[in-house]
C-alpha cells in the first residue's frame, strides 16, 4: 500500500468518526425540547432522529459541494491537510460535549480545515469570500432569525390558546411536538451529514479518485456518512440535550413545538441554498426565542451569553488545533507522521471520555432541575446532577410507655413503690 492510499484510508475513517461525534453532539438540536417538555421519553427521543437523520442525508448534496469547493482551493489540498482539519473538528466537538456546551460542529470542522490550510499553504489557500458569505454571515443571520421566529411563534401560540385549559393545550402540543421534532431531525440530516460528505469528497479529489469538476459525491460516501451520523445520534448527546432543554429556559409543550418548527424552517431553507449553517446555533436561537415569546418565562441570559462566547471562539480554536496537527504530521512525515497523528487523536478522545464518566449524564437524569452555570455537568464531580427519587422518610420516633414521665432537668425522680 502506498503512502497516499494509506493517508486516504485514515482520512475516510477520521471523517466518519467526526460524523459520528456530530451525530451525538447535535442530537439535542432536535430532541432537547421534546425531552424537556415530556413529549417523548428520552430513549425514544434519540431513536427517532437517528432514523430521520439517515433519511435526510440522502435528500440534498448542496452543502457537500460548498465544503468541497467553496471554502478552500481544491487544487492546493493534500490528504495531510484534510486529516488535520478533521482532527481540529473532532477535538473541539468532544471538548464542548464534555462541558455540555451546544457549540457548532459545522464551524469546528470548517475552522479545523481553514486552520490546517493556512498552516500548509498560507492565507492564499482560503477562499475568504466563501467563508464570509457561506459560513459567517449565514451563522449570524440564522441564529437571529431563529430567535425572532421562535419568539413570534411562541407568542402567537399562547395568544391563540388563551382561555383554553392548560392541561388540554399541553396534551395537544405534546403530540404536535413529535411531528415538529421529526422535521428538525430530517432537516439536520439534510445539512450536517453533507459536511462530512464534502470532506471525503475533497480527499478523493486530492487523491485523484474523482474529478475536481464533479459536483456530487459518490454513492458510497453518501451512505457511509448517513449511517455514521445515525449511529452517533442514537447514542444521544445527553450533556448537550440537558443544557438546551433545561439550561436556557424551562420548556413547556407549546414553546417546544414553536421552537422546533422555527428550527426546521430555517435549517431547511439554508440547506436548499447550500449554506453551511450551524444547526446548533439555530436550535439554540429558537429555544431562546421560545423563552422570550412566552409571557413570564425566565430566560437564563448568563448561560446564553457564555454560549455565544463559545461560538465566537470555535472557528479560531478549532483552527489552531488543525494547524498544530498539520505541522506535527507534516514535520514528521510519511507513515510515522500519519500514524502518530491518528494515535494522538484517539488518545485525546479516550481521555475526554474517561473524564466524562466522573459526572455521568444520561436518560435517567437529563431532566433534573438545572443548578449551576453552563458547565454544571462537569462541575458536578462524581455525584449525579439530581436524584429524581422521593426522599426516604425518617423512621417514626418510639412511643413512650404508659404512665411514663420524661425526666426534667434539676428534678430527681423516684421509682414508684
Swiss-Prot record:
GO biological process terms on file: phosphate ion transmembrane transport
GO CC, one annotated term: plasma membrane
Membrane topology according to the record: Multi-pass membrane protein
Localization, UniProt: Cell membrane
Reaction(s) catalysed (UniProt annotation): phosphate(in) + H(+)(in) = phosphate(out) + H(+)(out)
Alphabetized Pfam families for the sequence: PHO4
Keyword field contains Transmembrane: yes
Recorded family membership: Belongs to the inorganic phosphate transporter (PiT) (TC 2.A.20) family. Pit subfamily.
Protein's UniProt name: Probable low-affinity inorganic phosphate transporter
Species in which this protein is naturally found: Mycobacterium tuberculosis (strain ATCC 25618 / H37Rv)
Higher taxonomy: Bacteria, Bacillati, Actinomycetota, Actinomycetes, Mycobacteriales
Amino acid at each position: 500500500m502506498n503512502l497516499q492510499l494509506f493517508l486516504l484510508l485514515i482520512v475516510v475513517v477520521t471523517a466518519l468518526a467526526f460524523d459520528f461525534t456530530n451525530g451525538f453532539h447535535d442530537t439535542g438540536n432536535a430532541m432537547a425540547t421534546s425531552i424537556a417538555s415530556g413529549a417523548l421519553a428520552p430513549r425514544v427521543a434519540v431513536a427517532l432522529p437517528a432514523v430521520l437523520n439517515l433519511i435526510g442525508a440522502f435528500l440534498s448534496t448542496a452543502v457537500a459541494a460548498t465544503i468541497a469547493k467553496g471554502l478552500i482551493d481544491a487544487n492546493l489540498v493534500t490528504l495531510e491537510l484534510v486529516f488535520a482539519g478533521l482532527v481540529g473538528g473532532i477535538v473541539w466537538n468532544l471538548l464542548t460535549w464534555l462541558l455540555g456546551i451546544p457549540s457548532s460542529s459545522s464551524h469546528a470542522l470548517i475552522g479545523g480545515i481553514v486552520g490546517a490550510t493556512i498552516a500548509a499553504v498560507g492565507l492564499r489557500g482560503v477562499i475568504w469570500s466563501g467563508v464570509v458569505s457561506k459560513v459567517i454571515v449565514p451563522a449570524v443571520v440564522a441564529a437571529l432569525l431563529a430567535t425572532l421566529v421562535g419568539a413570534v411563534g411562541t407568542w402567537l401560540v399562547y395568544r391563540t390558546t388563551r382561555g383554553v385549559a392548560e392541561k388540554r393545550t399541553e396534551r395537544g402540543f405534546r403530540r404536535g411536538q413529535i411531528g415538529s421534532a421529526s422535521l428538525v431531525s430530517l432537516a439536520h440530516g439534510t445539512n450536517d451529514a453533507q459536511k462530512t460528505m464534502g470532506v471525503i469528497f475533497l480527499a478523493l479529489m486530492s487523491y485523484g479518485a474523482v474529478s475536481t469538476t464533479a459536483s456530487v459525491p459518490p454513492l458510497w460516501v453518501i451512505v457511509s456518512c448517513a449511517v455514521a451520523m445515525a449511529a452517533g445520534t442514537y447514542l444521544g448527546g445527553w450533556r448537550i440535550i440537558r443544557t438546551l432543554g433545561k439550561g436556557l429556559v424551562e420548556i413547556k409543550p407549546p414553546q417546544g413545538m414553536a421552537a422546533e418548527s422555527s428550527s426546521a424552517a430555517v435549517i431547511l431553507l439554508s440547506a436548499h441554498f447550500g449554506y453551511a449553517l450551524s444547526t446548533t446555533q439555530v436550535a439554540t436561537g429558537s429555544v431562546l426565542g421560545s423563552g422570550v415569546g412566552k409571557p413570564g418565562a425566565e430566560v437564563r441570559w448568563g448561560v446564553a451569553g457564555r454560549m455565544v462566547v463559545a461560538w465566537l471562539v470555535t472557528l479560531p480554536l478549532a483552527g489552531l488545533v488543525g494547524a498544530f496537527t498539520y505541522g506535527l504530521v507534516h514535520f514528521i512525515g510519511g507513515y510515522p507522521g500519519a500514524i502518530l497523528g491518528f494515535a494522538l487523536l484517539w488518545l485525546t478522545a479516550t481521555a475526554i471520555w474517561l473524564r466524562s464518566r466522573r459526572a455521568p449524564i444520561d436518560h435517567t437524569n437529563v431532566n433534573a432541575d438545572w443548578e449551576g452555570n453552563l458547565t454544571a455537568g462537569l462541575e458536578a464531580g462524581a455525584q449525579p446532577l439530581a436524584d429524581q427519587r422521593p426522599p426516604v422518610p425518617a423512621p417514626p420516633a418510639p412511643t413512650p410507655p404508659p404512665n411514663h414521665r420524661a425526666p426534667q432537668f434539676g428534678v430527681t425522680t423516684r421509682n414508684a413503690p
